[in-house]
Each structure stands twice: as C-alpha cells, then as structure tokens.
Regions:
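Conserved beta-strand signature within the Rossmann-like core of class I S-adenosyl-L-methionine
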Residues: 252-262
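Plant-skewed but cross-kingdom recognition/interaction modules and surfaces
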Residues: 95, 167, 240, 248-254, ...
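Cationic, low-complexity basic patches in intrinsically disordered or flexible, solvent-exposed regions
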Residues: 7, 11
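Rossmann-like AdoMet/SAM-dependent catalytic core
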Residues: 268-367
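A short SAM/SAH-binding and catalytic strip from SAM-dependent methyltransferases
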Residues: 225-238
Length: 367
C-alpha cells in the first residue's frame, strides 16, 4: 500500500493538479496516508519511520507554514497571504512557546530586511534560499516596497506547489499582466518569472547549477544583495555549505547573508532536535556547522565573509523587537513556564555576515 501511495504522490507532484481544490485535498490525504503508513510500519518494527529526506524536508516547510498560519490567526502578526499556502489545522494543541518563537523569528527577519531596504532600495536584490511558502515578497509588495529583484529557490516539489498555490489566487495578484503569461507559467511548473519576482527549483549543493539559475534571470552581481536562509543550512553538508558561501562571496560584490538556525546542538535541547529529525529520517547534515557560534563564524570567515555577527533569538526578542508590540503579543497567550520559552529561544541564532567593508552593509543587524 505504501508503495502505491508513494507512486501516486510522485505522479501528483509532476503534474499541474492543484488548480482544483478537490485534487489538492486528495493529494494532502494521500500524503498523510503515506506518512501514517510509514509511521505504523516503523512502529511495529521498532524503527524510525521510513520517510525519505525529500518528503521529510517538505514536511518541515509545511509544519513551519502551519505554525505561522496559526500564529497569524491568533493575532501575533498580520499576514494576509499566509492562507494562500496553508490553512491552520483545526483542533491541534498550539503551545504558546512555539507561537511566541515563530513571532520572534518572523519579526527578527523582517527587521533586517527593512534595514537592508531602507539603505539600498530600490536598486538592490533579495535571494531567499529554501524559501518554502514564505510570503515576504507579497507583504513587501503590498506595502509598496520597491526592489529590483526578488528570487526564491527551493526543492522542485516545493516550488511546484507554491507556484500552483499562487496561480489559484491569481485574481488577487496585481503582479501578473495577462492570461498569456499565466499560461506560460503553467507550462513551466517549476519556474515562475514576473517583472521582479522569480521562483525556481534549485540545488544549493550544486553551485554550478545554482549559477546557471542566476544567469537565467536579470541578476546584477554588482548590486547590494541580501541572502536569506531560515533553518536551511542545518540540513546541508558542511563542505557544500562552504562551497555555496564561497561562490556567493566571490560573485556578489556587496552582499549580506542573514541566517536563522538552531545552535548549541550538543545540549539536551539540541540532542532532542537531532533525535526528532532522525525519527523523520531527515538528515541534519549541517549539524557541525550549527554546533556553536564559533563553528558558524569559522565557516563564514573561511568562505570569504569577513564580517560576522550573531545574536541569540532570546536577546533579539527582549532587546530588539518593538517593546509595545512584544507586550501586546504577550497578552495573547499566557505561558505556564516562561523559562521554557527562554531556553528554546537560547538555542536559535540570528547571524549576519557581509563580504564587503561597506559601512551600510556592516551596520545591518540587531542592537
């Protein structure tokens, strides 16, 4: 049964089946059945679930999107576009610590993005690695923020699903000029190009392939460029991460890399994170990269990023997020144990690295 379900999942991933809501629901049901069957068989055998890395990494995107949608629904922040990609699942216990953690994550990233745009927009670029169902571009556009180029790169299946989700809401999009353009996008279901927004499937472990993707769109390697990465490099082999960082540092004249990752993976919390990923058969190939601040700093500096700074998310939450909004959020859900939130946020880091001595770039970061 599991092999039959997996065959149908692959078929659905390779055709444009998401324009009908019924097909989409059917796909989700198949996927849930596959996970359930894998979990049941593995439990009976006393093993971790037999879910391959590809589905496991897709799962991390869907989980993150679901938590973000739940936080938006609770009023933690405003994001009218999150529901394009995920409706929060009903009747699921939502731990306030997790909702608060996603609030710190989203708001922290937004602070850095706004700093970058305030200094360089519109003649600048943002490239989001492992973007998943991120909605940053749509929110920036809604607010009238101008940018020359915004590129998202992720796994082929994730990109296909995101494009189809966007096309299902095409009547809401002012970015698309005509039906002919939409038809072109349907024909190429793992690539989408608009005037300044691009989304493509790409392999971060293959820098030659990535460079081909860059050259296929109007990227300007001389313009200030902000790279975004949220819980991505922790899943990438450390040598591949070095190759990626070196290529970016060499090709882009003025670049800033904002990374959000788990850290201190040798702690009890870190070992639990690794255990959970192992149970889902997701390879945490970048565990040594995220082992500590020093390990991250060393890899960035060896890869050509001479200016590296990092902050625990707990410090950003307390010292850098707008106080009035933080106090508002803290009234939405009361914490049984505030120390649990602090411990969780202590094990995640924001890091900002630059490959240029440009003071506008170096000044980007948190207080």
């Amino acid at each position: 049964l599991a092999s039959v379900v997996k065959h149908w999942l692959k078929l659905f991933n390779n055709v444009n089946c998401f324009f009908s809501e019924d097909y989409y629901i059917f796909y989700k049901s198949l996927k849930n059945l596959y996970y359930f069957w894998s979990m049941m068989v593995s439990r009976d055998n006393g093993e971790a679930p037999n879910v391959d890395d590809k589905f496991g990494l897709e799962w991390t995107n869907e989980v993150a999107t679901d938590w973000k949608a739940a936080a938006v629904k609770r009023g933690y922040w405003v994001d009218p576009f999150i529901y394009w990609f995920q409706q929060p699942k009903q009747n699921i216990l939502r731990f306030p610590e997790m909702l608060r953690g996603y609030y710190a994550r989203v708001k922290g990233i937004r602070i850095v993005v706004e700093q970058f745009l305030d200094k360089f927009a519109p003649a600048c670029q943002i490239i989001n690695f492992g973007a998943g169902f991120d909605t940053m571009y749509w929110n920036l556009s809604k607010e009238g923020r101008q940018i020359d180029l915004y590129l998202e790169i992720d796994l082929p299946d994730v990109v296909r699903k995101k494009i189809n989700c966007i096309l299902r809401h095409s009547s809401d999009l002012y970015s698309f000029a005509c039906n002919e353009q939409l038809q072109m996008l349907i024909d190429r279901n793992d690539v989408m190009h608009t005037l300044n927004y691009h989304i493509m499937a790409g392999d971060l472990c293959n820098t030659d392939d990535l460079m081909e993707k860059f050259l296929s769109i109007p990227i300007d390697f001389s313009k200030p460029t902000l790279f975004l990465s949220e819980c991505v490099l922790v899943y990438v082999n450390v040598d591949r991460t070095k190759n990626l960082l070196q290529m970016l540092s060499n090709k882009f004249a003025k670049a800033c890399f904002l990374d959000y990752e788990p850290s201190n993976l040798n702690s009890i919390f870190g070992r639990k994170f690794l255990e959970n990923m192992a149970q889902m058969k997701v390879s945490v190939s970048g565990a040594s990269f995220c082992e500590s601040v020093d390990s991250m700093r060393q890899i960035y500096e060896e890869s050509g990023w001479s200016n590296f700074k990092s902050w625990k998310v707990s410090a950003v939450y307390l010292n850098s997020l707008p106080r009035q909004d933080r106090e508002r959020v803290e009234t939405l859900d009361l914490l049984d144990d505030p120390e649990m939130l602090n411990q969780m946020l202590d094990h995640y880091l924001f890091s900002v690295a630059t490959n240029s001595d440009d003071q506008n770039l170096i000044s980007i970061g948190f207080e």
